[in-house]
Amino acid sequence: MAARPKLHYPNGRGRMESVRWVLAAAGVEFDEEFLETKEQLYKLQDGNHLLFQQVPMVEIDGMKLVQTRSILHYIADKHNLFGKNLKERTLIDMYVEGTLDLLELLIMHPFLKPDDQQKEVVNMAQKAIIRYFPVFEKILRGHGQSFLVGNQLSLADVILLQTILALEEKIPNILSAFPFLQEYTVKLSNIPTIKRFLEPGSKKKPPPDEIYVRTVYNIFRP
């Protein structure tokens, strides 16, 4: 039996959370080795385990994969979450890239100065409501299907759901003007593999707290 994927990252969301989401959506069990000290990072670097000297890193199928998007693409392609043809894969990739631009604001938010964090919440809300959510609302309204591409679950759906739910933690009514996205979010959240991931006790990480921020600084600051 093939070894389970092993994820190397601090014990928090960051750029690894999307990987956790996609593995969970695909129904793949995985292990985690949490980085807690600089010494653990140096050991990975000195052992030539990190191609570009940085995490996230995922051990899977005999490989040590780095670079978040490459990891996501590999897992999605392996588990039929990356479309049935070139056109579908291109659409999925385009939607994922746009959503990751929005998600990046959430990833960096806990590392801002306290005075800047509330301003950034306003900025995130504006970008979501004006730039990103109208695009996905139009797509769902236009084709009348349950998923963004090919009428089946894809990487694009998983990353968008992750981003929507993370935004709702900060802005509970963020979808109030988007009825199709509201329905879409409920449907996706009830897919059995995703529903299990959203339940207490799963490997889904909680919102970043001061302990996580301090740990990240201690590991990665020069």
UniProtKB/Swiss-Prot annotation:
Residues of the GST C-terminal domain: 85-208
Alphabetic keyword roster: Acetylation, Cytoplasm, Transferase
Coiled-coil blocks: none
Residues annotated for substrate binding in this entry: 212
Residues annotated as binding glutathione: 9, 54-55, 67-68
Subcellular location, principal: cytoplasm
Gene Ontology, cellular component aspect: cytosol
SUPFAM superfamilies reported for this sequence: GST C-terminal domain-like, Thioredoxin-like
One GO process term, biological-process aspect: xenobiotic metabolic process
Limits of the GST N-terminal domain: 3-83
Reactions mediated catalytically: RX + glutathione = an S-substituted glutathione + a halide anion + H(+)
Entry GO MF terms: glutathione transferase activity; identical protein binding; protein homodimerization activity
N-acetylmethionine modifications at: 1
Tissue expression: Expressed at a high level in brain, placenta, and skeletal muscle and much lower in lung and liver.
InterPro entries documented for this protein: Glutathione-S-Trfase_C-like, Glutathione-S-Trfase_C_sf, Glutathione_S-Trfase, Glutathione_S-Trfase_N, GST_alpha, GST_C, GST_superfamily, Thioredoxin-like_sf
EC code(s) of this entry: 2.5.1.18
Superkingdom assignment: Eukaryota
Cell compartments where the protein resides: Cytoplasm
CDD domains in alphabetical order: GST_C_Alpha
Assembly with partners or alone: Homodimer.
Family membership: Belongs to the GST superfamily. Alpha family.
Reported function: Conjugation of reduced glutathione to a wide number of exogenous and endogenous hydrophobic electrophiles. This isozyme has a high catalytic efficiency with 4-hydroxyalkenals such as 4-hydroxynonenal (4-HNE).
PANTHER family, per database record: GLUTATHIONE S-TRANSFERASE, GLUTATHIONE S-TRANSFERASE A4
Name listed for the protein in its UniProt record: Glutathione S-transferase A4
The organism of origin for this protein: Homo sapiens (Human)
